[in-house]
Amino acid sequence: MKKILLLFITTAFISCETKITEVNKLGGMTYYGENTGKKFEIGSEVSLKIAVSLVNAYAEGDFDLMNEMTTDTVFFFEPSFGKPIPVVNPANEFLSQIQSPYDSITRRIWNAIPLKRAGSDYETVTVSFIENRYKKGEVEKLRIVDRIFIRDSKVFRVNQWNGTVD
């Protein structure tokens, strides 16, 4: 009898199937503007890879790859410009111009976090990294945070903040 009971319990445990249900957890909060009160969820791996590839492609001077990942016009906001500027695709000339003062650029990414605001049709990926700009034997080091806006797997806006590294 003990053997039959043990066999029955073992069979019951083996035949049980664990059911896993994934739930998107919302967090954070929008505090200002038309989206006040809306929360965020973690964005997609696809958007994460696009943003990281874009950041690396710029440092490597692969402007054709950057053009493939962007919409017809990308709005770029960098603090020294004062306001967002529209960059028309292909952007090779614009990108070459802003890289022209430097012999080369390297970037070391610290982290990248994809987010999607509840109810929105786009995701943002915040990428923070160290950028080294080499020029005539000297190195200019910057801490940079890019917030890259992605809709339908295409970048349509980049907001950038930077500061110097001591």
Question: Which residues are covered by each model-predicted region?
Answer:
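Positively charged n-region of N-terminal signal peptides that target proteins for export
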Residues: 1-4, 17
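Sec-dependent N-terminal signal peptides
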Residues: 4-13
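Short, low-complexity N-terminal intrinsically disordered segments enriched in polar/charged residues
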Residues: 16-60, 68
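Short beta-strand edge/turn micro-motifs at domain boundaries
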Residues: 19-23, 141-166
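A solvent-exposed, acidic/Ser-Thr-rich amphipathic alpha-helical stretch
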Residues: 63-115
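A mature extracytoplasmic/lumenal domain signature
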Residues: 70, 80, 129-131, 146, ...
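Short, cysteine-centered beta-strand-loop-beta hairpins and adjacent loop/turn segments enriched
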Residues: 83, 132-141
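A short hydrophobic beta-strand element
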Residues: 121-131
